[in-house]
Amino acid sequence: MTLSSIPTPTATPPDILRCAYMDIVVTDLAKSREFYVDILGLVVTEESDTAIYLRSFEEFIHHNLVLRQGPIAAVAAMAFRVRSPEDVDLAEAYYQELGCRTERRTEGFVKGVGDSVRVEDPLGFPYEFFYATTHVERLAWRYDLQGPGALVRLDHFNQVTPDVGRGRGYLEDLGFRVTEDIKDEDGVTYAAWMRRKDTVHDTALTGGTGPRMHHIAFATHEKHNIIYICDKLGALRKSDLIERGPGRHGVSNAFYLYLRDPDGHRVEIYTQDYYTGDPDNPVVTWNVHDNQRRDWWGNPVVPSWYTDASLVLDLDGNPQPVIARTESSEMAVTVGADGFSYTRKDDELAGFKLGSTL
């Protein structure tokens, strides 16, 4: 299936500050609370029998994550904060010119957030744009509450889409800037990292069957905080929640850990990427066959990390249909009979890394 190109609107795009929160549907609120609050230590801003509003320790807006009880695990919204109330108007007009479905609620879609617009964007993702929000206590100095694995900030989203190049152009029109990408010698793009704040990304595009949500990522201060989370999961006999890592990414240079929540939603714990705020910040391009692009130490990527992702919902709360990627898949070209990776590009031996062997 050939996807149509996305036109560049004449309307001014909203001035997006950062990724702000994700609204996800879970099938067992109690189990999700145990994972996000009891194990990961996110702060409960407020909760009811049907929803829990969570934030990280340095956050001052109402929440970074909403857990809502529902029949199917999925993502209801990926929300971005904009610079002013007028930027909500700009977002609505921008997507209306694109021909996207929009819904505006002056009272907000969730507690703690005011005037907002949600859209079904050209890639099929449920985006939200808002400015007005309830301020809450920033707990950065409350070391009596923070554990050694404290999650201090929401860092980024990651989205799965069939055509990364198409999505990249759309997000660049929206004002995002590319910091890193993965390509092959033929120019096929497998992934791209896009930012608004001065880090490596606020969201990333991963090539695959989509629209689906690959992961939400929270930052810790240092890598030892991630090691503690691993130790805690081991002590609780919940090491099966660890999908991948800990390790260091090549892309972003960040230390990472990937977990799966009780519904399979993927959560990354992430720390120590780099500053990208200068206007001439260079794009870093990785070869898809570079064995150190996804893990700087060359450790293999588990297949589920490539294949599994969360469904996303339309504005009526129904799962969006997904479209398969037709370009080469990153897993296929790097692993297995038809794939190869290298540790040193000029080596004669090329294969794929399994354990300690190439």
What positions do the PLM features span?
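Vicinal oxygen chelate
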Residues: 2-12, 18-27, 70-162, 189-194, 238-358, ...
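Core segments of cupin and vicinal oxygen chelate
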Residues: 14-17, 23-61, 109-110, 159-200, ...
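Short N-terminal helix-initiation segments at or just after the protein's N-terminus
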Residues: 14-27, 62-66, 92-93, 99-107, ...
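Conserved active-site tyrosine of GNAT-family acetyltransferases
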Residues: 32-37, 95, 124, 167-171, ...
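Conserved short beta-strand elements that form part of the metal-binding/catalytic scaffold
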Residues: 42-76, 119, 125-134, 180-214, ...
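N-terminal entry module detector
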Residues: 47-116
